[in-house]
Amino acid sequence: MGIMTSLRQGDVHRVTAETDVLVRVGLDGCGQCNVSTGVAFLDHMLHQLSSHGLLDLEITATGDTHIDDHHTNEDVGIAVGQALSQALGDRRGIHRFGHFVAPLDEALVQVVLDCSGRPHFSYGLQIPSQRIGSYDSELVKEFFVAVVNNSGLTLHIRQLAGTNSHHIVEACFKAFARALRMAIEIDPRRAGAVPSSKGVLEQAGGQKS
């Protein structure tokens, strides 16, 4: 992997009997992306996340894609979620909340999220086709479930319009990227304080900051 200079950075290496995944995320980046998961459509969506979220993202993965893409897709999501949580740390100084509505031609998708430390996922995509190229459309939900459970995000995804499966999913990733970018950016008025009236936010895994 290349050199990353982001001040807020997460590095995760996940190895199982099914996959070997290495993820590096820089929150204060400019959208540099070097991704190779062996799942072409997932790579395309991760490029959207990096580009529109201004995340520096490096991911390499090998897995049992000769069976199907499920394990690689899920384990990449797990590692991305863990890397995000690691990079956010105690979440001091961030805006915390983010929202965005992204269009792609006829598709329109809304994403609202909270870097709360409490994982919750509400999913409202209605993808008309079972596959997008060779990618199983059900894996979109599984990717975000893995990210949410390992990052501690509260994430709501709503499809407002759309008939083309590729457009719907790409609009979703773009909206997620922009909402995440809004939430993780530093708020200078907070002066480094935790963005919670309790003075503390939980990190993924239930560890309080």
From Swiss-Prot:
Q: What is this protein called?
A: Imidazoleglycerol-phosphate dehydratase
Family to which the UniProt record says this protein belongs:
Belongs to the imidazoleglycerol-phosphate dehydratase family.
Q: What broad class describes the main subcellular location of this protein?
A: cytoplasm
Query: Is Cell membrane given among the entry's keywords?
Result: no
Q: Where in the cell is it found?
A: Cytoplasm
Highest rank taxon of the organism:
Bacteria
What this protein catalyses is: D-erythro-1-(imidazol-4-yl)glycerol 3-phosphate = 3-(imidazol-4-yl)-2-oxopropyl phosphate + H2O
Q: Name one Pfam family in it.
A: IGPD
Q: Tell me what organism the protein belongs to.
A: Prochlorococcus marinus (strain MIT 9303)
The Gene Ontology terms for molecular function here are: imidazoleglycerol-phosphate dehydratase activity
Respond yes or no to whether keyword Translocase is given for this record.
no
Entry's Gene Ontology BP terms:
L-histidine biosynthetic process
Any one GO CC term of this protein is: cytoplasm
Root EC class: lyase
Q: Give the pathway listed in the UniProt entry for this protein.
A: Amino-acid biosynthesis; L-histidine biosynthesis; L-histidine from 5-phospho-alpha-D-ribose 1-diphosphate: step 6/9
Recite the UniProt keywords alphabetically: Amino-acid biosynthesis, Cytoplasm, Histidine biosynthesis, Lyase
Q: Which cysteines are joined by disulfide bonds?
A: none
Which region is the signal sequence?
none
EC numbers, comma separated: 4.2.1.19
- InterPro entries membership: IGPD_sf, ImidazoleglycerolP_deHydtase, ImidazoleglycerP_deHydtase_CS, Ribosomal_Su5_D2-typ_SF
* Gene (name only): hisB
